[in-house]
Amino acid sequence: GGDLLVNSVGYVALTAEQQTEMESRLAGEAPVACGPAGSISIAGSSTVLPLAEAWAETYQEACPDISVTVESGGSSSGAGRVCANSAKGTPVDIGDMSRDWKATEASRQANGFVLDCLVGDTTRDAAQFQVAIDGLSVVVKKGGAADTCVSGMGGVTPDQLRWMFSAETAAELTTAGLDMSEITPNGDGNDATHKWSELDASCPDAEIALAYPDAASGTYEYFFEAVLHEAEQGFRAGQQSSDDNVLVNTVTGDEAAVGYFGYAYYQENLATLTALPVKNSDGNFVAPDATTVRDGSYNPLSRPLFMNLLVDASTLEDTLPFMHFGLFTDAGQAK
């Protein structure tokens, strides 16, 4: 089977090597086509949500005796709920995450993919499966002033993204090792404003409005680490939401706005959004697409997406066939 279902909801499918690794994690279980009659509960990352929903719909068509419920809530919710951390909600069988586990949430066993919960029910373990690759997309309104601006520049650098999104002053960025003359060659020296014209004289004299996920999101955390380098000042004020559609609407409603979210939501809105090319580690401006996300050239914003299965014999009777169905069968891959 192909990778059409993964691609159809806006993700990039695993490489052959990654698929082989995931298959080895299922080894010895010889999953049947459908698990025993019952239910599967899934919650977590809003980025993984479209894929989880697509797999659930397809699996229930093939296995009508299985009921699959899917909720969002963010990666922290996915980690917490599969570990039965009541502060994050009711326990689930599968926790979705668009980031890796934190050392405060779980400890990794020697095999590398089973994790012991450290918060919630500490007798619980979770098995981590990579299900797709995401290219975190930095977007502006297609054809708008910001689009024209960045197009003329060829793209943006990670340091420019840090200046745009961070609450750090120019002096603090300089102390952190950034060259402000390269970031804002037309800078106005005013830390209270962040204008497109500071990036290039040909760009509009308009304040850069921000749209980004809330702090419970793995997407927020990934960008915070990869672009802001966990700067203690955090993000500048902007439109924050756990609903990616709110972020899309914010960006499409303001030519001077810039936002970021998972590749799936960019793919859903290609008619109204442009994803900015970002300078990678080789010095090339690269936009996210199926090829650049998969081969890693869209760095530093390519990242793995995960589903984490509760390690419990009765639960795994249903969740392992579901995972095998999603990752390896024609029906799961080619809706």
Predicted regions and their residues:
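Flexible loop/hinge segments at secondary-structure junctions
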Residues: G1-K335
